[in-house]
């Protein structure tokens, strides 16, 4: 069992060389909670990566992704996009979480919150002329949608986000519907063993992207399932996750969202 001293040491390693913590962002008449991480070895401004949560909210795994990006030289920020409808931590059953909370969060609300997040970042050390987004699971779908929403976005990376699905008043479109509207290059990272996103859905999306002549690429990892980057779950597939992480960083750089060089001792 981990001791308090061990836990403190681990947290110190995770936060060495960066500033990180909770903040709030004015958005749509509310104060939107968010987690932010950025380097402390440079005056900025920093290229910005918006990190969009899994269905479980901005929990430790998403915060860790922000810290990892900060150690690469980015200002990374993850807004709590469910906060008006509820708190994911209040649910222990995934089906109840999805039906009672996640499905009640309107896409329109989410996209505007992300706009306000980008604006806030531009006033707090971020360079939104170098703006990217990445999202996981629920957030992977949102990353596709945001790439068709914000013309200032330079790059997007969507990790195992649903591509097609049942449309509702709150979820009127899926990535396959916005392929023709993409205004930023998108990299999709998917698992070949993901039963929730079958191969035919991926092929449908690829066809839509080709028809739209979109600047996008989908990578499928044959041995990975859903949530293969979630290193706190049995679904984690280290080889695919590590390759996907490097592809994400390369995608950002390739499309004009290069990280600020950070001294190796802070990484």
Curated annotation (Swiss-Prot):
Q: Per its UniProt entry, which superkingdom is the organism in?
A: Bacteria
Active site (UniProt): 137, 194, 226
Report the EC code(s) recorded for this entry. 3.1.1.45
Write out the entry's keywords from A to Z: Hydrolase
**What is the catalytic activity of this protein?**
2-(5-oxo-2,5-dihydrofuran-2-ylidene)acetate + H2O = 4-oxohex-2-enedioate + H(+)
Key word Signal present in the record? no
Q: Which GO molecular function entries does the Swiss-Prot or TrEMBL record give?
A: carboxymethylenebutenolidase activity
Supply the Pfam families for this chain.
Answer: DLH
Is Mitochondrion set as a keyword in this record?
Answer: no
Name the family: Belongs to the dienelactone hydrolase family.
Q: Please identify the protein, giving its name as recorded.
A: Putative carboxymethylenebutenolidase
Species the sequence originates in:
Yersinia pestis
């Amino acid at each position: 069992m981990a001791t308090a001293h061990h836990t403190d040491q681990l947290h110190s390693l995770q936060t060495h060389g960066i500033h990180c913590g909770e903040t709030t962002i004015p958005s749509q008449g509310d104060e939107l909670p968010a987690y932010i991480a950025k380097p402390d070895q440079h005056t900025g401004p920093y290229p910005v990566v918006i990190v969009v949560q899994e269905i479980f909210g901005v929990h430790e795994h998403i915060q860790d992704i922000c810290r990892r990006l900060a150690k690469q030289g980015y200002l990374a920020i993850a807004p709590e996009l469910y906060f008006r409808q509820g708190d994911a931590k209040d649910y222990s059953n995934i089906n109840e979480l999805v039906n009672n909370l996640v499905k009640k969060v309107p896409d329109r609300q989410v996209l505007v919150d992300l706009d306000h997040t980008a604006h806030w970042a531009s006033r707090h050390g971020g360079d939104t002329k170098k703006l990217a987004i990445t999202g996981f699971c629920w957030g992977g779908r949102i990353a596709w949608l945001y790439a068709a929403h914000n013309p200032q976005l330079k790059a997007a990376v969507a990790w195992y986000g649903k591509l097609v699905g049942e449309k509702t008043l709150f979820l009127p479109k899926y990535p396959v519907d916005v392929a023709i509207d993409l205004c930023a290059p998108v990299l999709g990272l998917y698992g070949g063993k993901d039963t929730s996103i079958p191969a035919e859905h991926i092929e449908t999306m690829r066809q839509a992207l080709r028809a739209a002549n979109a600047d996008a690429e989908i990578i499928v990892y044959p041995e990975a399932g859903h949530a293969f980057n979630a290193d706190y779950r049995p679904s984690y597939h280290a080889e695919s996750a590590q390759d996907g992480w490097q592809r994400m960083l390369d995608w950002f750089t390739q499309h004009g969202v290069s990280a600020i060089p950070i001294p190796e001792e802070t990484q």
